[in-house]
Amino acid sequence: MRPLVSALCAFALLPAFAGVAGLDAVSRGADPTGQRDSAAVMQKALDELNRAGGGTLYLPPGKYRLEKPLYVEGGNSIRGAGSSAANWPANRPTILCVAFGRGDTNLVKNAAVKLRGGASLRDVAIWHPDQRFEDPVPYPASIWGDGHTSVVDVTLVNSWCGFYNNHCSSMLVRGFRGTALNMGIRAAYAFDVPRIEHVAFDPAYWAASGLPGSPKTPSAVRKLEMWAENNLIAIVAGEQDWGYWWDVFVDHAKGGIFLTVVPDDKGERMNPGNIAAGKVVMRNVQVGIEMKNVGYPGFLLTYGDIQARLCCMHYSKVPDYSKFHAVGIKPYYSWNAAVQVTGVKFSGAKTLFRSDKDKDGLIYCINFNDCTFSDWKDCAISQLRGSLVASNCRFSGKGAIHPGENLSQIVLSGNMFSGEAFAVKPSASTVVARDDREKGVVSLPYDIPEPKEREFKGKVFDVLDYGATPGKVDDIPVKDSSPAFAAALAAAGKAGGGTVFAPAGVYRIARGIKVPSGVELRGSFEAQHYGNSTHRGTQLYVYAGKGDPASAPLITLEPDAGVGGFTVYYPEQGVTDDSSADEALRVKRYPPTLRTAPRCQVRNMAIVNAWTAIDAITVRSDGLFVTDVTGGALDAGVIVGHGTTGGLFRDVHFNYTGWVGQGKYENHPRGDDWDKTTTCGMFADFTTRVTRGFVLCDAKEVKLHSCFCIMVAEGISLEKDPYTGGSFRGSTWGLAFDANTNGIVGHRGAEPKFVANCAMGVFSRQQGGYFVKTEPGFAGAIASVNSEIWSGRSRIVYLEGGRTILSQFLSWCCYEGVVKKGASLTVCGATFASNNGNDKGEKTTITYERGSSGAVCGSVDGRRFLKVVDETGGKLAWRNNGVRID
């Protein structure tokens, strides 16, 4: 029987930018003029999609009046025709007109659009027509989310609160821009990895809309700006573990970013987060970044320009949490969480950076590298306690640094001061190391343009019209649908391009399929999703190639082809390489899930338990674009090389919870992942011995941006290319390695030049591993800038070859770095937070063995426990550091 979604897919011939919609809202009775309430008919359509297994409700250009909330379940999406509300109605966007909630201070209960895990909202604008710029009043949040939600290319015309998610898991907020009046984003209790990308908050969005009631005169616009400058906090963040934010712009706000703790939904805990942000620009704010409570190991900020009136960055004093203690909630506070800043311009404020964090025993560190401080009123930096590191910074003004009398250490390397460095003389107890000629601390620029996803033009070919048979998770089809997919793809290729659409459902795939040039193979998902966030949507159950990894990949992309919108699952995959285990439990080798080609596009895929997920090395794949891919592989997540030049892997996120956490998958691993008698423990043991997250061979100008892998043996594997003999040349931002054995591994014969900006890592498996590890015969260079590692089992480096640079490196209770004969390590502008297991400086920070070389400069241990053992016989340079112990 033909599923409901496809039976209604006459609307699949919508414009390509609409996606391949299951239902068209206007055809179902929605009013695009905004005169009548459309909420009821839109909700009915969403419910139909949900019953059919998932899909997209498309909103053509127009205004849609909502008189009650919309609920979007997992596996479903709302997608409009465009979100830009500027110069309405000339550009014909899709606008949701929220006609309820005026004066309602409850942000959650009646939020306009409510997204469940695995749901998405994209390409719409949201407008509250009864809001008044002269005297704004509260409204519920424009968007509420719960769990793995995606909000993409959404414009806020005049929201009180734009997006609220207090259980935001691996949320994605991208292309989220507009006017917010009280809060732009409020997100907490997120784990591995919440992402906020390409967001902007500015009163100009409302003013530029031209919508009724918008401010139109300069005085009216200025009134709105003044409101924002006294009321708006653009981003409020509670616990966001491994949060990665990129390209944040704020103009006119009381505060740009507020890092704090908030209660969870049950009122049982209040935890902070460890967040890394990059490319942050702020104008006309009172305080740029307010750090009320920062989770360990700290907050990383890379690249930006912050202009403020009171303070560009403020690390506030320890909050008074007594009212929470009185009701049994114990907010967590990290006493030694660091703040590290690279490549940021600060200007205009009374004090540019201020730390009021003051209590006996504090060992935190503030660390600046390649920053510019100018136009301050009182001083550039004021810090009461802890340690201060500043390298390669430029200070334009008098009395740049105001040291508190209890400041422990100040390390200044390679800075330029136009006036006196200190506003007051450091106290006698403060250790000061200063060398303005020391230029050994490295800073490397990084940027990526905002990439645009390609939409494939042409006819839509429905695989059901070619005989595909969809089933359900609990009713897997017997019939192989790969011939139907192949026939639809061949027809699209013959037509010169188009989209081959597979509606929601489970499809048995027993043979590999090829996607012709100019064609995209599409499932029902419109945004990033995870295997454990929903069992709905289009799922490919793979029975092809078991035991034959050299056979045809599941999906082979030809040049200029694309694939997206699927969950891919291997029902016969196992968890262990133990030969004595039952056959069903033993790991199976398969051909790659995806094989790429030049200029291909891969998006919105969850690849749950592949052998190799993405093969970008068999065919040179210049200019490939891979975005929003999640899941996990057992051999390698991504392999790229063969001379590939140019390309981007964005938000590629390998986390086995997509398999482990999805109870609908019959063979999902179960139990404690530390207990090897359970299938989950067997699986974790296998992946942390065998699996490589990203294998980088001969590729140049290929960037990895905000990518993550958990529980693998090697996060980044730098290898000699088997086709060309060459090695990787490129940079990354936002690499995260969680519970890995090792982070970056340089293998014998490889000669890469690899740069990791703003990486985070925990290396706790297989008795603990290293952030960087190199083999004998490795002849390349590895550089890390403003990165952090933590966890008691994690160690710093184990180097047997090549050159490694750790610049502005934050090691939080991690020690025991080893540099062997033939290897070189430079540690510069680094921060070490001795804590767990090293309360008296017992552990060695780094040992340079005989035959090794390197340098340590401009670095500090917050507890004065910098313990570097030099066995090189004069080949280790020691320059301008904090206190060193023997």
Protein language model regions, located:
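Short, solvent-exposed loop/turn segments at secondary-structure boundaries
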Residues: Q35-S38, P138, N166, D474-K479, ...
